[in-house]
């Protein structure tokens, strides 16, 4: 609070802003957002981490923090709405173009790209990237800092008020995955120390909902393809999985195997260049780019030609 608080806030902003000389500590916030699909994936997956953290801080015993976070959650909800519907409309456009062209094989990538839409395997690769980067935002699976914050009443668990326990966790345990002898195992850890792990599990469950809706779009279009979340150890830079290479199915693989197959799991420069080639502006009301379907309804149920922004010249 006061002058000390302002100084600390300025230093926090400096640390968080990032630059070429001092990049942000977390990879998700160093990743470029060169196209709309990247933006939609960021708002769906990375902003969802913000939702989980804000929900936990909304349980704080420090009332100003709790009330502030509850207000901020309304903004996060809109971010994730933009992300889910944006990715969904991209998938819808691809499905419609494939059906119109009579293409049934989702892996006929060149033919699908020639239609001016983004092929489904590339969308899956973008999903893999942003999901795995977002998992790193939860920090170490076992954390004394998280335990201390919980004990101090600064931060609770996700939807703490719905959990039916003593809310002290003194003698409780929680399952945490570990790497032992080059195998993934599950160990029971003190629940207090596994606060981050539990929050990450809640995130995974929450994030899966959008994938189910995207897959229903493909099912209605009779396209044999389904989006999946990769294993939580895939492409990780923070936590117990960071020292090893793990494929999307959860198998520990060698560095050479990773190097030879990473391009089939994560977007390449050529994938990015193709997506960028589709990013052409449309200036007329009701006109949409080839790679994205029109929205079902406008924001706040407004018509397609509604002027959301009005410019008044002085």
Language model segments and positions:
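Extended, helix-rich structural scaffolds rather than catalytic motifs
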Residues: 99-314
